[in-house]
């Protein structure tokens, strides 16, 4: 009986210390402005919805079809999902985005993930768009991307009776279908692409959600100063100074220099295990190398191998639970639908 009691007491003490350690780490995370995706769907909706373009089931379903429809591109070959592939972490897995006529991005910019992009404070690497509705208009028109003028996109969509009917259900039959409305609808779908992870489970109170290495990685991530730029719910997503201490070793690949003040949007770290290659020009393929490079150029510290391994384990814990997306059957083109062009 005495042995059993001692073992039981030991287990209770161990459990108590474990809980205390987890509570301390959560407090540390909160102090570093690391915030979880809420557990409640109602709270998530408050986080991602906007009064100017509210989420409805009809808009989400229509937006999903438009997101996957290559007819929004001039060639009829490229959809939003081409560069922001929902099966590939919301990115495309190549250093620089490939667009119209198989042209690589002229600035050698990497495609950011669309997952959790609603949590960003700005969109694009130079932060030029304030929200998803504005962002969705850019790639469709950009010559090196989808290369489709506004009028062409609108004519294609309005020529397809099934789309006209769906827009009527989503917005009312009197609402005019415009290019801006098409982009707004895509944005509604993108707002639903939020991926809570076991990291969020831990911050929301589940002590066992992260293992020892992941917790050590989270603590190291905070202690080294990584959360300074990769904080908030998004773990990034806002404008930050780049090359604070020294030059990025691949700075000469591409001509991107940030916004007018040299600031760069810090990418979200959510699902980062799935979104290699890394950095704005996609020149680093491993998390280990990315961690060490960031320590050097941003923080001015040499992150040792053990610390790097722990941070890497933490970053992998940010891989989230994806919403189930059923690939849509798109409505057929009609006789007066403008034809694709590769010119």
Residue ranges: model-predicted function:
Residues 2-18:
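Gram-negative bacterial Sec-dependent N-terminal signal peptides
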Residues 1-2, 251:
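Generic cytosolic/nucleocytoplasmic N-terminal low-complexity/intrinsically disordered segments
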Residues 19-343:
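Periplasmic c-type cytochrome electron-transfer domains
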